[in-house]
Amino acid sequence: LSYRDGRYFDFVKEREFQFPLANIYNHDPIYGKTGTNLANQMTDDEFKTYLYMMGTRGTAFWELYYSPEMIDEGQKWDINAEYLEWAKKNYHILKNAKLIGTTPDKGNTYGYSCWDGEEGIISMRNPSASVKTLSFTLDRNIGAAESLKGKTLNRTTILNYKTTDAQTDYQTVKYGDVITVTLQPGEARIDRKSTR
């Protein structure tokens, strides 16, 4: 994840590409033996996190480079099916992805903020070996609609990986709030924000 996500930051922040992240073509996901060192490397939870984090990049083209003998490990076929159904159902939100945080190339926290109207999905990840925070303002700069001003947004969990703090669904935030999240080493979170 970190290498490819680092390229996204390079494209957007350094090279200033001016097109939607959904239009970037990737050879992803890859979970195969040929030309990789991936054999038997991901647990089911790691594989699920890998897929869902990639989904928040906003792309709709999935090549599924899998070695059958590797994808047969654990519940990976079921996880793949669950993920593809989720990505299709939520593509109207995911396709509007924007970067948050800073490049993972240097071990920094980052994620993607995806919105469609008053409904959003926000991913957050700490690729480093130490506890770090990620802060962002919930506003139009990360894709949240200005029509959310004055409204309360509920948070529901889509994915938690290596999360240690007690989280509960329906924590509330408002447009303009600064959200600061402490992320454990290797932790990833994906939340839905909506007025429902």
Name these PLM-found stretches.
Residues 167-196:
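C-terminal beta-strand-rich structural cap/linker in extracellular carbohydrate-active enzymes
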Residues 1-161, 187:
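Active-site-proximal substrate-binding groove within the catalytic cores of carbohydrate-active enzymes
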